Each structure stands twice: as structure tokens, then as C-alpha cells.
Amino acid sequence: MTKLTKFDSIDILMKTLSSYVSNDLRESLKNNKVVTLSVPGGTTPAPFFDYLCNEDLEWQRVNVLLSDERYLPEDNIRSNARLIAKHLIQKKASVARMISFYNKNLSEEEFVIKYESQMSTLLPINVSILGMGEDMHTASLFPDSDELLDALKSDNTLHVVRPKSQPEARISLSGKALASAHKTYILILGENKLNAYKKACSEKTEINAPIRVVFGSNTSVFWADKI
């Protein structure tokens, strides 16, 4: 069963998550030459990244993989890669290798075709951090995306998705790629997200609640109120 842990403050949550993730990475590095850390975009995890980049571990052996990305240049204010470079690929973690999902010379579909085999070599994910929307999406696996079923069920690592609720096309890790993680942490804040998580627990299918693709004994949910 997926475990829910509630924290008294956002800061305590972020510090604790940083400690857990760094310890998981150290354990993974004992048995692997390189490891894969999958991370989300958005503003919510920025304080966590600020703590994690100061953790002592062999960052030069860590591949930082985006869970999803808007197909935009990396200097665009809405780019997940931009946020991760600003908050995570800093200080002790500056030597980590970040893998982004953008090539100005390729369309979204061309990018996926060209880089699918390369991205698949980064699996399984050793440690994954995910967010979740109030619609129960995770990464860019949105319930209102026509590509959702294929992204959940196919063997590919990458998928182009065009959610009706979003202004840009996105590239997302597939359900199979996300579910490959040895350890997953879902980071959510506020009562609305907590209620969405509870609703996801009661749903029967991943189509209605894509976050369910990572539910299981290796997944922990960290929650704090926004107040």
C-alpha cells in the first residue's frame, strides 16, 4: 500500500524529503555505477531542490531526468529544465548530469523518435519524485489528454501529449517508465491536493486517476498544508 505521511510544515517536509532522497541515492550508488533521479517541474518542489543540492553524495554519478516537460526552449520561463537547473543543478549537485526534453531542430514527435532508445537506457529509475494535480494527473499524464491510454499502456519511455487543459504540447515519461522506479515520493501541498489523493485511492482505473500508475508499496506520499 502507498503510505501517506503528514508534516507540520512545508519546510519540515522539504528537509525530510531531501534527507530521504539523498539516502536512497547513496544506497543505489553502492550497487550501480550511475543512478537515475527523476524529478518534476513546477514551483512546488523548488525548496526541496534547494536542500537536495547541498546533500553530500557522488553527484557526478547521478543522471537527473525530467518526469515531463513543456516543449519549450530551456530558457523559457515555463520550462521545467530552467527551474531544475536554477534550483537543483547547483552547489554540490552542479556536477550531476541533467537530461532535458527539448531540441530546437526537432518537432515533439521527432524528438521522441530520435531519443527514445537513449532515454530507455536510463531505466529503471532509482528514485522518483512526482507531483500530482487536483485532477489526479502526474508528470504530463493528464486525464483530458487523448494520448493518455497509449502513454499509460505502451512499452515506450517517452510520449508526446497534448492535454486539452494545457497551452503547450508536452513530452512525458510513460506510465511504464514512472512505474519502473525503485522508490517514488509524491509531493503534495494543501487540502485540495490531499482530497485529490484520497479520491485517487478510491478510483478503480488509471484513466480517471493517472497518479495510480505509481501506487504501491515502494511509493510514499508526503503532504503538508499550505498554511
Segments predicted by a language model, with ranges:
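Class I SAM-dependent methyltransferase SAM-binding "motif I" and its flanking Rossmann-like core
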Residues: 134-176
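Short, conserved loop/helix-junction motifs that constitute active-site signature segments
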Residues: 55-63, 92, 176-182, 214-217
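Glycine-rich beta-strand-to-loop/alpha-helix junction loops that act as flexible
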Residues: 39-44, 130-134, 189
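Ligand-binding beta-strand-loop-alpha-helix segment within the catalytic cores
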Residues: 60-129
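Glycine-rich N-terminal segment of FAD-binding domains in flavoprotein oxidoreductases
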Residues: 29-53
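A short secondary-structure junction signal
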Residues: 112, 139-144, 196-200
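N-terminal glycine-/serine-/threonine-rich phosphate-binding loop
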Residues: 1-37
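ATP/nucleoside-binding phosphotransfer catalytic cores, i.e., glycine-rich phosphate-binding loops
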Residues: 182-227
